[in-house]
């Protein structure tokens, strides 16, 4: 039996489905809900669970410790990032200002690279210089509507009962 750390009813739950379908393991795969990525990384370092979904820079930190990638969300062909505003009253001016600021940040990060922001990454993500140097060249996308194929995949996942 294998145990995967992920978050239920989320992108990592959907991606776990894709990975299990692709890998066709002999034994049952159990999903445990570990929402905090920092906790997942510590569990990986302590060999507590078989597989984990990690975002950057935690994924870079895990790879530095000779762990293996068995499935990458980048290879799944699905784009699940979203900015959601959940207010009872739409605040279009504030939403537009947020989108403009977000898109400016994306332009700056894509222009300068994530490693340019090493001090911020180290401060808020609690990683060292070696981890920052190991980060891949990540390119971010601006705010835009979701792709129809991604909406359909998410809808099918949520309504299928897995």
Language-model segments: which ranges?
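Hinge/capping helix and adjacent helix->loop/strand transition within the periplasmic-binding protein
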Residues: 1-5, 13-28, 92-93
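Short glycine-rich phosphate-binding loop at a beta-alpha junction
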Residues: 5-6, 84
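Residues at alpha-helix termini
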Residues: 23, 65, 125, 161-162
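Pocket-lining segment of extracytoplasmic ligand-binding domains
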Residues: 28-121
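Secondary-structure end/capping motifs
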Residues: 91-161
């Amino acid at each position: 039996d294998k145990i995967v750390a992920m978050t239920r009813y989320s992108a990592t739950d959907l991606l776990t489905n894709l990975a299990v379908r692709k890998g066709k393991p002999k034994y049952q795969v159990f999903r445990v809900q570990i929402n905090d990525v920092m906790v997942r990384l510590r569990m990986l370092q302590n060999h507590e669970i078989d597989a984990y979904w990690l975002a950057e820079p935690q994924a870079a930190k895990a790879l530095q410790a000779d762990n293996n990638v068995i499935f990458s969300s980048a290879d799944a062909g699905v784009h699940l990032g979203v900015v959601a505003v959940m207010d009872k009253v739409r605040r279009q001016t504030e939403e537009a200002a947020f989108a403009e600021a977000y898109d400016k940040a994306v332009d700056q990060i894509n222009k300068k690279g994530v490693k340019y922001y090493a001090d911020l990454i180290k401060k808020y993500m609690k990683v060292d210089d070696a981890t920052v140097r190991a980060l891949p060249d990540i390119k971010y996308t601006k705010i835009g509507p979701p792709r129809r194929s991604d909406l359909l995949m998410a809808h099918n996942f949520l309504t299928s009962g897995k």
